[in-house]
Curated annotation (Swiss-Prot):
Regions of compositional bias (Low complexity) in chain numbering: 47-59
Keywords: ATP synthesis, Cell inner membrane, Cell membrane, CF(0), Hydrogen ion transport, Ion transport, Membrane, Transmembrane, Transmembrane helix, Transport
Species of the source: Anaeromyxobacter dehalogenans (strain 2CP-C)
Chain residue ranges for the region called Disordered: 24-73, 351-381
Subcellular location: Cell inner membrane
Domain of life, per lineage: Bacteria
SUPFAM superfamilies the UniProt entry points to: F1F0 ATP synthase subunit A (SSF81336)
Official protein name in the record: ATP synthase subunit a
Transmembrane segments: 128-148, 190-210, 215-235, 255-275, 290-310, 316-336
């Protein structure tokens, strides 16, 4: 039996149960010789009027919505998936609640902070993704300070792994994209971005946690940091005049009318880089969680436990893949940030390279010419 058939049968059963609901009791037939009249409904509207059915459906919908709010969350598959990937003010955790030890306790951040962080229309109340970023920042400080205070010449265990990652970011990412001279200036930012994104990605795989990097606002903020540092590096390397001249796309002054086309194109190109960083990290982290939730949701959508024998192993394999993706996405964001920063430095380096090349060409040519003359003298002699 195919999945489509199972879904069709489930829908048919639910519709049949809905149609089999007891109908309202009809008004009594003629009594004492009077003509039958429709009994008034609960809202005081005669049942024979067309508006009665509309009012009844509206009241039922209102009652269902209120019950949904009182009962907690919508239990549909789509609502559950969105609940686990979107941001909010409620953090679920195990603990003592509901009269005992429970797994579905809730910490409402709005009740904790109240109106203390509201300034007019600006609401600074932290959400669960903000809490995850606080935890990632605290863990980053603990790991870095612990690695710095380690006095042994040969670090072991976790600190050996941390030192390996730091050396990898510097030598394989920063140095190769910026050069030895400029790498040390921007390595602290690249290392911070790498570990911060890595911790946020790993937090999203823990129970009762949330994936902050699957929030578009978080990835936009991270990309803006890279954007600002990239523009700072370019202006520092080329100067404001060289930076503005670079927006012409290398078109000479003799073709100045083409600047009307090149300057807008180059200006928009400045923002395509942070846009790529934003969408790449956001989409990759969001997609993995959606796939896991969809595979597990098949058990409840199809209404049979036998689906678990296929969906659970598949979800577990995707979960293990997400562990790898957590490192890969942190690496890609750091690599692209290094490339974009290095792109602002390369023009400055090229100018120096050409100057040095032309500066050394004269003496080299002179010495080469002198050697030819010296070598030819004995022959002529």
């Amino acid at each position: 039996m195919t999945a489509a058939t199972l879904v069709t049968l489930a829908l048919s059963l639910s519709l049949a149960q809905h149609d089999a609901a007891p109908a309202p009791v009809a008004a009594p037939v003629e009594q004492h010789g009077q003509a039958p009249e429709a009994a008034p409904d609960a809202h005081g509207s005669p049942a024979g009027e067309p508006g009665a059915a509309v009012e009844a459906h509206a009241a039922a919908a209102e009652h269902g919505e209120a019950a949904g709010h009182e009962g907690g969350h919508d239990e549909s598959l789509g609502a559950v998936m969105l609940h686990h990937v979107t941001d909010g003010y409620v953090i679920e955790h195990p603990g003592l609640c509901h009269g005992g030890l429970a797994w579905n306790c809730e910490w409402d951040l709005r009740e904790t902070f109240g109106d203390s962080l509201k300034f007019g229309k600006l609401d600074m109340t932290p959400t669960k993704h903000v809490v995850m970023m606080w935890l990632a920042s605290a863990l980053l400080l603990v790991v870095v300070l612990g690695a710095v205070r380690k006095k042994s010449l040969v670090p072991r265990g976790l600190y050996n792994f941390i030192e390996l990652l730091v050396a990898f970011v510097r030598n394989e990412i920063a140095v190769k994209n910026m050069g030895e001279k400029d790498a040390d200036r921007f390595t602290p930012y690249l290392v911070t971005a790498f570990f911060f994104i890595l911790f946020l990605n790993l937090f999203g795989l823990l129970p009762f946690s949330a994936t902050a990097t699957a929030n578009l606002s978080v990835t936009v903020a991270m990309a803006l940091f890279t954007f600002v540092i990239t523009q700072y590096a370019a202006i520092r390397a080329m100067g404001m005049g060289g930076y503005l001249a670079h927006l012409t796309g290398g078109v000479p002054k003799s073709l100045a009318p083409l600047w009307l086309i090149m300057i807008p194109v180059e200006f928009l190109g400045l923002f395509t880089k942070p846009f790529a960083l934003t969408v790449r990290l956001f989409a990759n982290m969001l997609a993995g969680h959606f796939v896991i939730l969809a595979l597990l949701g098949l058990i409840f959508a199809l209404g049979t436990p036998w689906v678990a024998f296929g969906s659970v192993p598949m979800a577990l394999s995707i979960f293990l893949l997400e562990l790898f993706v957590a490192f890969v996405q942190a690496y890609i964001f750091t690599m692209l940030s290094s490339l974009f920063i290095g792109a602002g430095l390369v023009h400055h380096g090229d100018d120096h390279g050409h100057a040095e090349e032309h500066g050394h060409a004269g003496p080299a040519a002179g010495s080469e010419h002198g050697s030819h003359v010296a070598g030819a003298s004995p022959g002529h002699g």
